[in-house]
A protein has these predicted regions:
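Secretory targeting and sorting signals
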Residues: 1-29
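Gly/Ser-rich "nucleophile elbow"/oxyanion-hole loop immediately N-terminal to the catalytic nucleophile
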Residues: 55-62, 107-115, 121-143
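N-terminal cap/lid segment of alpha/beta-hydrolase-fold proteins
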Residues: 30-61, 401
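Short substrate-entry loop that stabilizes the transition state in hydrolases
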Residues: 57-63, 68-103, 253-256
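Accessory cap/linker subdomain of secreted extracellular hydrolases
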Residues: 140-142, 151-239, 310-311
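Short beta-strand/loop motif that positions the catalytic acidic residue
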Residues: 240, 245-248
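Short alpha-helix in the alpha/beta-hydrolase fold that links the catalytic acid
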Residues: 242, 256-264
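C-terminal, loop-rich substrate-recognition/catalytic regions characterized by aromatic stacking residues
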Residues: 274, 282-283, 288-517
Length: 517
């Protein structure tokens, strides 16, 4: 119950923002040229929507169409500020409330087949009732709307371009990476769905099974998630040749960057990938209020090029654009591989045993709050590395760096683990450690195992969540491993222990990706 209360508090600002916007439709309709409509979605389910058209629409010509499905828990007026801006530059813009939320009918399908079919019905309606150009159709969204946009593009070749903002490529790898439940992230989604929507029996069953840690239902949960993952339909997306822009945040606690980057690398059509500091949807949130915003500016440029044919240069820029958590400038790369091209290995020498079931003090933070603090104040979660109790935390450190180290991409941990029980969970953290021993969190990731023989060593490979962070000269990097973190559900039997070793024929290490100096 405490966890759900925390989750509710974490999203309260988001819901308040949605509520404030939700009070304004009548005024907007009267003064802003917004038309509110009902659209029959899949199976006749009513979808509440609004349409904004260019001011110079005269019925003699057609305009490119952009469809905007709403975010999880947001009302249909979420995108009005951006819709008006896009309409002013010549687009027909149709925003609609996804099924199961607010005034739209039906139950929450969690980006399932009904949501995909709804998106096609919305496009059908727009082509029949607005001056939209059937040859130039785009779809964009934030969070839930982003995932639905990608799924719709895989199933509807009419979609020529997509902008996925804080979306996902692999839903399973988002909230179940390392075979570990990301419980705070799931609780946020579950709580918002309960408050602002109508959950289906299927979604309630999936969330209950997710929380319960019932391994007999694991295959069903994974299959459910794969059906809702754009990565499952990559062949269709590539065949359609949809121009896909993806933007996300380094600290996204709902849809971490790794799964988006992996999805991006497998796309073969026109594509662009952007990562910035922040948490889920926080980078693009100001744009929803009409404030200047890099994410929305690039989104409009993307559509201008691929729907209007404007030669604005976006197709000639480096397609991977990153902003470090430590600096304000952007860096360009030809692909995601190039971000991780240079690596430095830190040896995880010796043998160390830790006990489980107790939080050592090393944590990934609190969903939303921690990454927002990192975004606006450069204050990531911290830990006093010398004071971490070695009974519950294994610690390895590099030497001091004579020059600044620009960590870019995905740090990888390789080690050998000997458990005393067949199941267990560990969480690895990479810290930037200053002269006084205070560690600032650079990256982390959980790992859960089942079915191992107690007392028998096994090799473990774990990718930490991707990031861009600058370690100052004179600092060290430290890898900390413990077994409890409030972000995740742990699977350590009471009294279990984990031993980490570094065999001569298979040494343990953490491989840190560094930008070429």
């Amino acid at each position: 119950m405490a966890l759900r209360t925390t989750a509710m508090g974490a999203v309260s600002a988001t819901l308040v923002a949605g509520g404030v916007l939700g009070l304004t439709p009548a005024a907007q309709a009267a003064t802003g040229g917004v038309r509110y409509v009902d659209i029959a979605g899949d199976g006749g389910t009513v979808l509440k929507a609004n349409v904004v058209t260019p001011a110079d629409t005269d019925g003699t010509r057609r305009h490119p169409l952009i469809v905007l499905p709403t975010s999880w828990g947001f009302p249909q007026v979420e995108y009005l500020a951006q819709a008006q801006r896009l309409a002013d530059s010549g687009y027909v813009v149709l925003s609609y409330n996804v099924r199961g939320f607010w005034q739209s009918g039906g139950e929450i399908d969690v980006a399932g087949p009904h949501d995909v079919a709804d998106a096609a019905k919305v496009v059908d309606w727009a082509l029949a009732h607005t001056p939209s150009d059937p040859e130039n159709i785009g779809m964009a969204g934030v969070s839930y709307g982003a995932g639905i946009s990608l799924l719709a593009a895989a199933h509807d070749p009419r979609l020529k371009a997509v902008a996925s903002l804080s979306g996902w490529g692999d839903l399973v790898d988002s909230i179940y990476s390392g075979r570990t439940q990301h419980v705070q992230a799931a609780a946020v989604l579950d709580t918002v769905g309960t408050v602002a929507g109508r959950r289906s029996a299927e979604s309630q069953e999936v969330f209950s099974a997710f929380y319960s840690s019932d391994l007999s239902k694991e295959k069903d949960i994974v299959a459910w998630g794969q059906k809702r993952s754009p990565a499952t339909y990559l062949d269709q997306l590539n065949k359609n040749g949809t121009a896909i822009m993806m933007a996300g945040a380094w600290g996204d606690t709902i849809f971490p960057p790794n799964q988006s980057a992996a999805f991006y690398e497998r796309l073969t059509g026109p594509k662009r990938l952007e990562f910035r500091p922040g948490d889920h949807a926080t980078a693009e949130l100001p744009g929803l209020f009409g404030l200047p915003n890099d994410v929305w500016t690039d989104t409009e440029r993307w559509f201008d090029h691929y729907l209007k044919g404007e030669d604005n240069g976006i197709d000639r820029e480096q397609p991977v654009r990153l902003k470090s958590r430590s600096t304000s400038g952007y860096e360009g790369y030809p692909d995601w591989k190039s971000v991780n091209a240079t690596r430095n290995k830190i040896a995880l020498a010796g043998s160390t045993t830790i006990h489980t079931n107790v939080d050592s003090g090393a944590d990934g933070g609190i969903v939303f709050l921690s990454s927002i603090l990192d975004q606006v104040a450069k204050l990531p979660p911290v830990a006093a590395i010398p004071l971490l109790p070695r009974r519950w935390a294994a610690v390895w450190q590099s030497g001091k760096y004579a020059t600044a180290q620009q960590v870019r991409g995905t740090a990888k941990v390789h080690t050998t683990v000997t458990p005393t029980q067949e199941s267990g969970t560990l969480v690895a953290y990479l810290y930037d450690v200053g002269p006084l021993g205070l560690g600032k969190l650079v990256a982390n990731a959980p790992y859960t195992f089942h079915g191992h023989t107690p007392g028998k060593p096994f090799g473990l490979d774990l990718d930490l969540f991707s990031t861009a962070y600058d370690v100052p000269a004179g600092h060290r990097l430290a890898l900390v491993v413990d077994t409890v973190d409030p972000l995740y559900i742990e699977h350590n039997p009471s009294g279990a222990r984990l031993t980490f070793s570094s065999p001569a024929n298979d040494p343990s290490y953490v491989s840190v990706p560094l930008r070429g100096q």
